[in-house]
Regions:
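ATP-dependent small-molecule kinase phosphotransfer cores
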Residues: 1-51, 57
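Short linear interaction motifs
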Residues: 46-60, 115-118, 169-179
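Conserved acidic residues
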Residues: 50-51, 73, 127, 131
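Conserved phosphate-donor/acceptor-positioning beta-strand/loop module used by diverse small-molecule
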Residues: 55-57, 66-93
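Small-molecule kinase domains that catalyze NTP-dependent phosphoryl transfer to phosphate-bearing small molecules
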Residues: 62, 91-149
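Short, compositionally biased leader-like segments
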Residues: 140-174
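Short, basic/aromatic recognition patches
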Residues: 164-190
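Short hydrophobic alpha-helical segments used for membrane anchoring or interfacial signaling
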Residues: 192-194
Length: 194
């Protein structure tokens, strides 16, 4: 799937040997523009509020595309400790260590083509851009209760803002974010200690 996405972002369609062919700049937004058209069709057919989930945004430019267009767009990242994630991939999907390393490499934003920052997945950057971070421990493969509880929490907040007060961790994160914005560093790419 990642190769198909990279091909579409580079050429505007799925092609064999796409990395050897010329980069077409307008293709970078082909996927999100297509998804955006589908969203508009769904909203038009529903004639009411439509709740839409886009699964697995792995390119930061695609995330930014939706953030710029929809005020109610919330980018969520679901994180698990590396040990739990690799155990999950090994046991349930039967991936080898080499396959897991390849997945990590592909999704890290690294690559050897000249437009990799535009066309390759970059999960790390998408996590940085996330509005909501959800913790999903995978130490019990068939127990998703922690994940479900967090999703219910945030969906309730999206539908009814102010219904649930922020946790202590969320308050500290807000203070850190505010300190970052008040920084004298022009790029605002600084850490904050609270």
């Amino acid at each position: 799937y990642q190769l198909a996405g990279k091909s579409i972002r580079r050429r505007g369609r799925i092609e064999v040997d796409f990395e050897d062919k010329e980069f077409i700049p307008k293709s970078v937004f082909h996927l999100p523009e297509t998804i955006n058209r589908v969203i508009k069709l769904i909203r038009k057919s529903k004639r009411d509020n439509a709740l839409i989930v886009i699964d697995a945004i792995r390119n930061p430019y695609e995330a930014k595309f939706f953030k710029d267009r929809y005020s109610a767009f919330h980018l969520m990242s679901i994180n698990a400790p590396d040990e739990h994630r690799t155990n999950y991939l090994r046991k349930l999907h039967k991936f080898s260590e080499k396959q897991i390393e390849e997945i990590d490499s592909v999704e890290s934003g690294k690559g050897d083509n000249s437009y990799k920052h535009l066309t390759n997945p970059n999960v790390t950057k998408c996590i940085e851009l996330s509005d909501i971070h959800i913790f999903n421990p995978k130490n019990e493969f068939d127990n998703d209760n922690i994940l479900k509880a967090q999703l219910a929490w945030y969906i309730a907040l999206m539908k009814h803002p102010g219904l649930i007060t922020p946790t202590a961790m969320e308050r500290v994160m807000q203070v850190a974010y505010t300190v970052k914005l008040n920084s004298g560093c022009i790029s605002r790419q600084v850490g904050a200690v609270v």
